[in-house]
Amino acid sequence: MAPRKPKVVSVTKKKKVVEETIKVTVTEEGDPCVITETANDQETQDLTFSIPVGENVTTVEIPVEVPDERSLPVGENVTTVKIPVDDRDESSPQPPETPVEVRDEPSPQPPETPASKSEGTLKKTDKVEKKQENKKKKKKKKRDDLAGDEYRRYVYKVMKQVHPDLGITSKAMTVVNMFMGDMFERIAQEAARLSDYTKRRTLSSREIEAAVRLVLPGELSRHAVAEGSKAVSNFVGYDSRKR
């Protein structure tokens, strides 16, 4: 869309100059006599200005002086004319007006007061204590899981080998488990006493076999020693067979 041309209004300014003649005569008495003569409408000057009428105008004040050596103007011989000047170029397109967004600034929040050092240290100590308690609980659970089977697994396997059709209750299995634990404790105590007699700090197979014969009765002790020596020989010779 082409820009609109501004409207032009012509203004005519007329200036009227009044000429005044002053005659001064001095008499013998010493009193001066002043005579003034005025001549009106001696010069008339027409000033024509073209004033464009537009939307965006700027007002500029231009003083105009018309000097005349022959005439003495009344008052200041200056005419002030306001000429609106259009800043826009007719050929240049008008730039589109950009909308201005008004954003609501968030109200400033009061600064947060830092927590005291004592509260921070208390929180840290509480966290450390909770972590330690959790670790202890995990260790206890692992121990319970490991000690839960104890000798039950081995006793059940041996029982199925000897009597595959025979079953056993959980209470009977706990009794057998406790019996096996007590028996091994007594064997360890007897072996420790024998090592004290020989003044040795390391238990050997001799002390273990002697402790088994002392704890278990006759035939059971001989069977246990034979099976134990067989298991040890198999364990030691496993690497040689693997090669």
UniProtKB/Swiss-Prot annotation:
Residues 133-142 have a biased composition (Basic residues). Residues 120-132 have a biased composition (Basic and acidic residues). GO terms for cellular component: nucleosome; nucleus. Keywords: Acetylation, Chromosome, DNA-binding, Methylation, Nucleosome core, Nucleus. The modification N,N,N-trimethylalanine is found at A2. It is found in: Nucleus; Chromosome. SUPFAM superfamilies: Histone-fold. Core component of nucleosome. Nucleosomes wrap and compact DNA into chromatin, limiting DNA accessibility to the cellular machineries which require DNA as a template. Histones thereby play a central role in transcription regulation, DNA repair, DNA replication and chromosomal stability. DNA accessibility is regulated via a complex set of post-translational modifications of histones, also called histone code, and nucleosome remodeling. The nucleosome is a histone octamer containing two molecules each of H2A, H2B, H3 and H4 assembled in one H3-H4 heterotetramer and two H2A-H2B heterodimers. The octamer wraps approximately 147 bp of DNA. This is Histone H2B.2. It comes from Arabidopsis thaliana.
